[in-house]
Structures are given as structure tokens and as C-alpha cells.
């Protein structure tokens, strides 16, 4: 689930 990473990178 890269979705978690997607939202994480969204912060950046």
C-alpha cells in the first residue's frame, strides 16, 4: 500500500 507513502509525501 503505497497510499500511505503518497499521503506522507503529500506533506512534503
From Swiss-Prot:
On the tree of life, the source organism's domain of life is Eukaryota
| Xref: InterPro entries | Tachy_Neuro_lke_CS (IPR013055)
Instruction: State which residue ranges cross the membrane.
Output: none
Q: Which GO terms describe its cellular component?
A: extracellular region
Tell me the tissue specificity.
Expressed by the venom gland.
The region annotated as signal peptide is none
Pyrrolidone carboxylic acid-modified residues are 1
Q: Which residues carry this modification: Methionine amide?
A: 12
Where found? Answer: Secreted
Its keywords, alphabetically, are: Amidation, Pyrrolidone carboxylic acid, Secreted
In which family does this protein belong, per the annotation? Belongs to the tachykinin family.
Name of the protein: Tachykinin-like peptide-IX
